[in-house]
Amino acid sequence: MINVAIVEDEQEAVEYLSDCLHRYGEKTGETFSFTHFPEPITFLEKYKPVYDLVFMDIRMPMMDGMQAAKKLREADTSVLLVFVTRMGDYAIQGYDVGATAFIKKPISYFDFEMKMKRIIFAIRQRDSQVITIVSGTAVHRF
């Protein structure tokens, strides 16, 4: 199972991303568990390194996705990060925080599927090189 966090303030985008994940799962046999965070502050306050993949909007109230991504990287360097945004001009900055991909809004399923193939490959590759230790409620990756 692939654990996904969706950090997105637009409910329509959250619903479409979850539909895309379900559709992709039905097509490929992948299973996903996802948690939605409507704003990045709550996501960061509650963050534990249990996610394989984080979808994050860039333009959000109180803290933008780029700032949130920098803080995320302080807590977890191995989680895959995908920006979902209308703001394509942030693509270069995304490399500074190790973004794996950008998905442009409005989201097209074809684009989503193409990027997910690369993302799943990257998750599998990372997992083959990482040891995960679960101790109570803590998860550590080495």
Where is each model-derived feature located?
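Active-site residues of response regulator receiver
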Residues: 8, 57-58
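Two-component/phosphorelay signaling modules centered on CheY-like receiver
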Residues: 11-35, 74
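Acidic catalytic/metal-coordinating carboxylates
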Residues: 39, 64-67
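A Lys-centered signature of the CheY-like receiver
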Residues: 105
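Conserved binding/recognition cores within well-folded domains
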Residues: 114-142
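Acidic, metal-coordinating helix/loop segments flanking the phosphotransfer/catalytic sites
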Residues: 33-53
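Short amphipathic alpha-helix used as the core "switch/output" element in two-component signaling
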Residues: 66-77
